[in-house]
């Protein structure tokens, strides 16, 4: 059976998410990936990716485009990266961001500081046999994970990957670099 994935397409690395999910779904007939710009675009989706970008901008645009409540109430799985991790939290250290409260966790924006402090590292992620090349770009970290949240990866700065039910959130960018293992883990989790 096909899987329908939407990518919130207001700002950020939308094209990279669409390409990664298309590749991850290539062997699933009837699957599709589409950009999401309006509330009605969420209908019939199995999953939604909330991309990296600027969390304050995405938060503002979600409100302006009438997407905040529909995304907060979305019943499918959510795959959130970088700014998406910030938005998916229930508590954020920046009052300019209106969190969606999809995952009970506290997130600190831009925990890595300036762009120059961004980095790549080989990261041990629970459930993966081999380390994952994680690209951190002005990344957030979760400073606290609530009840029912499975911490999948940590670095000295904090928690950088979590799962909560059918939702997954990452401080880094799994859509960059061609390693689709986390996309596949997420898609398999939709079937549970």
From Swiss-Prot:
Its EC number is 4.3.3.6, 3.5.1.2. This is Pyridoxal 5'-phosphate synthase subunit PdxT. L-glutamine binds at residues 53-55, 109, 137-138. SUPFAM superfamilies: Class I glutamine amidotransferase-like (SSF52317). Belongs to the glutaminase PdxT/SNO family. It comes from Methanoculleus marisnigri (strain ATCC 35101 / DSM 1498 / JR1). In the presence of PdxS, forms a dodecamer of heterodimers. Only shows activity in the heterodimer. It comes from the Archaea. GO terms for biological process: glutamine catabolic process; pyridoxal phosphate biosynthetic process; pyridoxine metabolic process. Catalyzes the hydrolysis of glutamine to glutamate and ammonia as part of the biosynthesis of pyridoxal 5'-phosphate. The resulting ammonia molecule is channeled to the active site of PdxS. Disulfide bonds: none annotated. One of its GO terms (molecular function) is pyridoxal 5'-phosphate synthase (glutamine hydrolysing) activity. The keyword Lyase applies. The active site is at residues 82, 173, 175. The lineage of its organism: Archaea, Methanobacteriati, Methanobacteriota, Stenosarchaea group, Methanomicrobia. It catalyses: aldehydo-D-ribose 5-phosphate + D-glyceraldehyde 3-phosphate + L-glutamine = pyridoxal 5'-phosphate + L-glutamate + phosphate + 3 H2O + H(+); L-glutamine + H2O = L-glutamate + NH4(+). Pathway: Cofactor biosynthesis; pyridoxal 5'-phosphate biosynthesis. Keywords: Glutamine amidotransferase, Hydrolase, Lyase, Pyridoxal phosphate. One of its GO terms (cellular component) is cytosol. InterPro entries: Class_I_gatase-like, PdxT/SNO, PdxT/SNO_CS. Gene3D superfamilies: 3.40.50.880.
